[in-house]
C-alpha cells in the first residue's frame, strides 16, 4: 500500500508517492501548465536496483480533474515491481490556510471542504487550488480517504499574547484578524528531527527553527509546540524574503499611496512580488547576491546584510521568549545551502550561547549535521526539510486513528 502526497497550485500539481511501511519515496513528479495543450509532466521513480529513472512528456491537460486522472493512471504504470499496482492507503493534501478552524490534520468530508472554502478570503491564491485537488480526487477515487494537512495548524498553539494584534478587538472577533503563521509543516518536521537528534523528548526541546528560502520564517518551539512565529495574517510579515518586504511600519502603505497614487491592490502586489531582496538589489536569488557581493556590489552586500540582520533580531527575540534554547535549526533552500548566511546570522551571538564553528559550517555535508563549536551551549543544526514526508506521516497517522484506510485495489 502507498500514500500519495499532493501539493496543488493554480496551474500545477506536485506529487510524491510514499511506501506505507517506512515512508520512503517511490515516485515523485510534477505536472505543470495545466489548462493548456502542452502541459508538461516530469516524473522520477525508484527501480528495483535502487536507481532513479526519470522521464518527461508533453500532452494536453484541460483542468485539475483531468490532470489527476492522468497522474493516478501513471502512478500504477511504472516499470518496476517496487510500485506495482496495489491499494492506495490515502491521499495527503497540503492546504495553506486552516484559519482557527483546523488545529491538526483531518479526514476530508463535505463539511471540511465547505470550511476550507470559507477560508479562501484568507488565502485567495492558494486555498482554491488546494480545494480543487481534494474535490477531484474525492470524485475520481471515492474509496480512498483524503487528509488535509494545514500549513497554519502547527502555529495554532500560539497563545493570544503572541497571535493577537494591538487593534480594536472586534476586528479579531468579527473578521478573524490575527497572526496565523505559515511553513508550519516544515517547522514541525525539523523540530521533530532536531529533538530526536538531540536525544530530547519533543515535549521538552526548546528550539528556534529558521525556514529560509524564497519565503522565509522563524518559529519559537517550546516543548514541541509553536509559541511564536514571524509570519502573521499573511506570509508578508516577518523576515525579509526573496520578494516580500517582511516587517514594515503600517504607515508606509499610506505614505506611498499619497505620494504615488497607488491603490491598495498595487501596494499589496509590490510588497509581495517586488520587494524584499529583489527590491533592495534587483534579484531574489541568494546565490547571485552572494556572488555580486563578493565582487563588490554595494546593493547586493546591503541586501545580504539586511536579510541576515533581520534573522539575528528574531533569534534574539525568540531566545528571550523561550528562556532556554537547546538548538537553532537552519532549513529551507538558503538555510541548508548558504554557509555565508548561517555565519552572518550566528556570529556575534556568543552572549546567547551561540558559537559557530566556521570550519564545520563551510564543509559539504548531506543530511542533518551540527555546525557549532564544541564549547557552544546552544547547538546549531542544519536539517534538510521534507514537507512531503511530514504530510505523508501525518496522513498515515490520521487515517489509522480514524480507521478508514483505502482498501480498494487500483484498476
Swiss-Prot record:
Active site annotation, chain numbering: 151 (proton donor/acceptor)
UniProt: ATP binding residues: 14, 211-215, 285-287, 333-337
Listed Gene3D superfamilies: 3.30.420.40
Cellular location(s): Cytoplasm
Pathway assigned in UniProt: Metabolic intermediate biosynthesis; acetyl-CoA biosynthesis; acetyl-CoA from acetate: step 1/2
UniProt site (Transition state stabilizer): 183, 244
Binding residues annotated for Mg(2+), in chain numbering: 7, 387
Required cofactor names: Mg(2+); Mn(2+)
A biological process term (GO) from this entry: acetate metabolic process
Catalyzed reactions: acetate + ATP = acetyl phosphate + ADP
Keywords associated with the record: ATP-binding, Cytoplasm, Kinase, Magnesium, Metal-binding, Nucleotide-binding, Transferase
EC code: 2.7.2.1
InterPro entries, alphabetized: Ac/propionate_kinase (IPR004372), Aliphatic_acid_kin_short-chain (IPR000890), Aliphatic_acid_kinase_CS (IPR023865), ATPase_NBD (IPR043129)
Location, primary (coarse class): cytoplasm
GO MF terms, alphabetically ordered: acetate kinase activity; ATP binding; magnesium ion binding
Note describing how the cofactor binds: Mg(2+). Can also accept Mn(2+).
UniProt GO cellular component terms: cytoplasm
Family affiliation: Belongs to the acetokinase family.
Function noted in UniProt: Catalyzes the formation of acetyl phosphate from acetate and ATP. Can also catalyze the reverse reaction.
NCBIfam families per the UniProt record, alphabetical: ackA (TIGR00016)
Record's subunit section: Homodimer.
Listed name of the protein: Acetate kinase
Species of origin: Syntrophobacter fumaroxidans (strain DSM 10017 / MPOB)
